[in-house]
Amino acid sequence: MADPRNAGPGDGRLYRMPTAFGPALGPRQAPAGMCHDPAASPRKSCAYAAWRTDAGLLGELLPPGFALRGEAVVVFEFSYMTDIAWLAGRGYNMLTVRIPATYRHGDASVDGYFQPVVWENLTEPILSGREELGWAKIYADLPAATHKHDEIVCRAEWMGFRFLELRLGARAAGGGALQSGPVLHRKYIPATQHWGQADVDYVTLTPGGGSQARLLESATAQRCALRIARPRWEDMPTQHAIVGALADLPLLECVRAGTYQTVGGKDLSDQVRLG
């Protein structure tokens, strides 16, 4: 007799590998009898900077069907999250890269932010985000931000190689949170055996509304410095092309930078498949 824990995909519950042990718990599926309050979780502290850059180089990061929207700007944001309900109060950190873009599919178009890559420092959100949502998540070491005098410093590293550092200073109260959506992603899963082909290749959308996040405080930075170190293959064997492409972008002008703190959010179960 089959074990009911392993009824498998198609029974209305969320599964991820390994499937032999029953439905997968995570941000969009809690243990039986438990529910998470989106108004109370997570607590998030963010630091961001938006830079004007070269339109030609930035456009090379967009998939087919996408075009730059407005001025050529690339946004880097560090998020430090704690008190996450689905992790039983634990947390993790994240670095996102976003590009204002328009996606056209058929006769429709969507204005939003294309997110070519996301770094996180914990396995669980990486797997659930890649497989369920189509977010392009990969791993990096993202230590806690450091504060010295009036400056905040955020760093991203991979096995000892520091590939990105953001410094913000001379902050003045106010400015609000960074606009959070809609966010567009290209979900891609390669085919087994048929190497070079895809089992999945389509665009997904994270809607901008529906979050119960409340802004606690915010500040605008008057000083902003971003350093992207170009890695050799030996430094980042599987990610050097990713970081190298970002390092190619000239940082012409910081058009906006700041910090903010929020509490609450949403589980992203409103994610939409396009195409």
Q: What do the predicted segments below correspond to?
A:
Residues S41-R43, G89-N93, K148:
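Solvent-exposed loop and beta-edge segments used for protein-protein assembly and interaction
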Residues P27-Y80:
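N-terminal ordered "arm"
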Residues A2-A30, G129-G275:
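Interaction-surface and assembly-scaffold signal
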Residues R52, S79, P100-T102, W119, ...:
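Structured loops at beta-to-helix junctions and adjacent beta-edge loops in soluble globular domains
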Residues T53-G56, M81-D83, T102-G106, F161, ...:
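Generic structural motif
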Residues L68-T102:
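Short, structured protein-protein interaction patches enriched in aromatics and acidic/basic residues
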Residues R98-E132:
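Hydrophobic alpha-helical segments and helix pairs
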